[in-house]
């Protein structure tokens, strides 16, 4: 169902997560993975900027899977931020057209994380509609396979959806009433038994039930987790919700990871964007570095008029005007200082006469 492109080795050397020009001191035992289509390169770049700031020395490599729509300039910028970019082909045969429209094909790249355990002690997957707000040191200890129960604040009713939300119709052997597991943040850790067999189980599930799947990656991983809960409970762990917190949750203010799953993202909804100015600052930095911008529509833009959301549409001008104002202020202060010095010199010359 999915496979890495022939020139994209699944477990090869990847560029260390470090400041540009800094030579890594050792081979890392940790890997951060992302998957991005070309039109979402801005989201990956913004995420990496936050990851770097809050985790300046995480001892992790970064691997960004991408489709053939990634611009060379964006790829170069992602690599300058410490990532290795690898092409990934996702076969969506058998899925409904509406499911293909709903999902990012690169979300299927997360299944490759099972086999990446052959080269790393821990592998972390992050969807790109995420804000990193704090250190991720604690997340690496989760596992052997860890994923979070969907944040109940997402529904607005204080309840978690059932796993049935991932399906167009029931699938035998899958409990649709079980709490839905969100797969936007996942951890794989060495000690997980037969990881490649688990990957194959997920891919076989996609192949067997494709037309029934609304959110294919999440459907397959929920089915896998239900099987593991019965057959291998020691291999399955619940990821603490603070590592997969929805923006609607009051806990999002302090959560290390905020995940804007659902229709409203940090870049297409003014209300959501206004709540996370840190994401906007990083997004503006990405563009200042030469990265591509979000090109789609924005809902609820009025919430941000004149406020934080203005950064998304006009931060370049704002920064430029601020720099000009600071320059003018410095020049005025210098002129005032020169004038004051002249006045002081004049007073000193007049002092003996007074």
Positions of PLM-derived features:
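Short, acidic, metal-binding catalytic loop of nucleotide-sugar glycosyltransferases
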Residues: 50-58
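Short, charged/polar "capping" segments at the starts of alpha-helices
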Residues: 68-74
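A glycosyltransferase accessory/donor-loop signature
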Residues: 2-36, 46, 64, 190, ...
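GT-A fold catalytic core of metal-dependent nucleotide-sugar glycosyltransferases
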Residues: 87-91, 108-159, 187
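Short internal beta-strands
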Residues: 61-68
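Conserved catalytic core of nucleotide-sugar-dependent glycosyltransferases
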Residues: 141-204
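Active-site-proximal specificity loops/subdomain of glycosyltransferases
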Residues: 74, 80-116
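Conserved glycosyltransferase catalytic-site signature
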Residues: 44, 107, 111, 130, ...
């Amino acid at each position: 169902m999915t496979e890495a492109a022939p020139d994209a080795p699944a477990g090869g050397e990847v560029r260390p997560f470090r400041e540009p020009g800094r030579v890594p001191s050792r081979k890392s035992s940790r890997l951060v993975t992302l998957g991005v289509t070309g039109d979402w390169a801005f989201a990956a770049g913004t995420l990496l900027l936050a990851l770097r700031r809050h985790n300046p020395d995480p001892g992790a490599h970064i691997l960004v899977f991408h489709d053939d729509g990634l611009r060379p300039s964006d790829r170069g910028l992602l690599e300058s931020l410490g990532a290795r970019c690898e092409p990934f082909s996702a076969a969506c045969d058998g899925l409904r057209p509406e499911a293909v429209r709903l999902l990012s094909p690169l979300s299927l790249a997360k299944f490759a994380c099972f086999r990446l355990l052959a080269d790393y002690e821990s592998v972390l997957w992050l969807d790109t509609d995420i804000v990193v707000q704090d250190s991720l040191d604690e997340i690496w200890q989760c596992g052997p396979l860890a994923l979070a129960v969907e944040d109940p604040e997402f529904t607005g009713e204080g309840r978690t959806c059932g796993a049935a939300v991932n399906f167009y119709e029931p699938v035998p052997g899958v409990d649709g009433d079980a709490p839905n597991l969100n797969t936007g943040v996942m951890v794989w850790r060495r000690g997980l038994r037969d990881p490649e067999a688990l990957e194959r189980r997920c891919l076989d599930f996609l192949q067997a039930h494709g037309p029934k799947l609304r959110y294919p990656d999440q459907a397959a991983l929920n089915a896998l987790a239900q099987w593991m809960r019965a057959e291998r409970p020691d291999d399955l762990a619940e990821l603490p919700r603070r590592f997969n917190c929805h923006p609607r949750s009051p806990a999002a203010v302090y959560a290390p990871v905020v995940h804007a799953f659902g229709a409203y993202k940090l870049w297409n909804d003014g209300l959501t964007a206004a709540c996370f100015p840190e994401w906007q600052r990083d997004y503006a930095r990405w563009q200042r570095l030469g990265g591509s911008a979000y090109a789609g529509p924005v809902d609820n833009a009025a919430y941000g008029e004149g406020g934080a959301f203005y950064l998304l549409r006009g931060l370049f001008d704002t920064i430029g005007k601020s720099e000009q104002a600071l320059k003018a202020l410095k020049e005025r202060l210098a002129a005032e200082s020169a004038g004051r010095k002249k006045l002081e010199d004049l007073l000193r010359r007049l002092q003996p006469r007074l």
